[in-house]
Amino acid sequence: MTKKISFIINGQVEIFPESDDLVQSINFGDNSVYLPILNNSHVKNIIDYNENNKLRLHNIVNFLYTVGQRWKNEEYSRRRTYIRDLKKYMGYSEAMAKLEANWISMILCSKGGLYDVVENELGSRHIMDEWLPQDESYIKAFPKGKSIHLLAGNVPLSGIMSILRAILTKNQCIIKTSSTDPFTANALALSFIDVDPNHPITRSLSVVYWPHQGDTSLAKEIMQHMDVIVAWGGEDAINWAVEHAPPYADVIKFGSKKSFCIIDNPVDLTSAATGAAHDICFYDQRACFSAQNIYYMGNQYEEFKLALIEKLNLYAHILPNAKKDFDEKAAYSLVQKESLFAGLKVEVDVHQRWMIIESNAGVEFNQPLGRCVYLHHVDNIEQVLPYVQKNKTQTISIFPWESAFKYRDALALRGAERIVEAGMNNIFRVGGSHDGMRPLQRLVTYISHERPSHYTAKDVAVEIEQTRFLEEDKFLVFVP
């Protein structure tokens, strides 16, 4: 089966090239996706587009809500096509693909949540619409301008959030899709076009693709005209973005991270196992927030392990795994055999839907992902802290929730960036940080309009007449 995906340039769907020489392909097993090859015309149109977004925040939120209502409709053609593409090309199960579409609708339709994101990260939901008085100045946040989003394909929703952050801050949004997921950003942009092809938000979007191999001169030219770069992915992807960013541009880096779960002597083993299983199974551990290790403190270790197996089997039913290709199955089997050869105890599902490897803390072979978890029985938090690594550990999920208050300072000081209740790793709460930062702050420029000389300060209750102060040598008189 083949699928053609056209580029979207400044909100307009480009005509798909007729010549095979102008087309590139991405292979997904027996299926292929065809896309145009980036050309000079695409680049020029992206660079030349300079329409300022004069919408107010409520206009932006209302437009996103309207788009979200379409995604909420299970019969919406874009939604149905998107689910089908995730299943056919990316190997998602029906439940996984449907859940992804559901989350897109949830995020777009959460008007209160979108307002609160701006309020929490920028300090006021009005700061991009008007000048706000702050002490001795007025302040307003303006968009950086042209933002490019170099997306990874492991977590489609991360791309959605990246795009929405740029939209909420009124930036032009150029999206470079991943070879592993050329579908999500394209589907979102097409749904914007469905609602209003001439809307300023629609027109501010471009969705393109280029491979990292071969000639990337046109991609580098785009990069040189960007005001802010949002880079997702592994070390090579991040390094490429940094290398080709113009010197004045901010590079917002979302690199690969690891996460784990702490179970602290729970009374409710069923809830503990349910939360841990969720954190293992969501995205089949391809997300930075996915738990790859569990550190269990306390008694009832064996009982917890049995409960975890039960819940992993439950998730295999309610949220079935993505399809594994030959190499992934081989990697799974290899890790199992390596662990057994090393004398570790291994519990594995006969269909490779999950695997539990029991080992001492720090003893770990390769991680094949796909719901493989290393389970460590430890005595106390001090035996866990060495495995929290600065700039490498993202999310630590904890059960019971009350234990988070005991450990959060120690975990944060070691480098943990996010602490959540077990079972909540995929929900980034409003008001929280992402990889140790507030991303919206880096998508805007704060401009100050400062008060005149006759405006008195708290510590200087007279007009600021600097020439007179110099003439009369009275500066020190006003030092508090």
Swiss-Prot record:
Domain of life: Bacteria
Broad class of enzyme this protein falls into: oxidoreductase
Alphabetically ordered keywords of this record: Luminescence, NADP, Oxidoreductase
Catalytic activity, reaction form: a long-chain fatty aldehyde + NADP(+) + CoA = a long-chain fatty acyl-CoA + NADPH + H(+)
GO aspect biological process, one term: bioluminescence
A GO term, aspect molecular function: long-chain-fatty-acyl-CoA reductase activity
This enzyme's EC code(s): 1.2.1.50
Matches recorded under Pfam families: LuxC
Coiled-coil zones: none
SUPFAM superfamilies: ALDH-like
Biological or metabolic pathway of the protein: Lipid metabolism; fatty acid reduction for biolumincescence
Function of the molecule: LuxC is the fatty acid reductase enzyme responsible for synthesis of the aldehyde substrate for the luminescent reaction catalyzed by luciferase.
Protein family per UniProt: Belongs to the LuxC family.
Protein name, entry field: Long-chain acyl-protein thioester reductase
Species this chain originates from: Photorhabdus laumondii subsp. laumondii (strain DSM 15139 / CIP 105565 / TT01)
Gene label: luxC
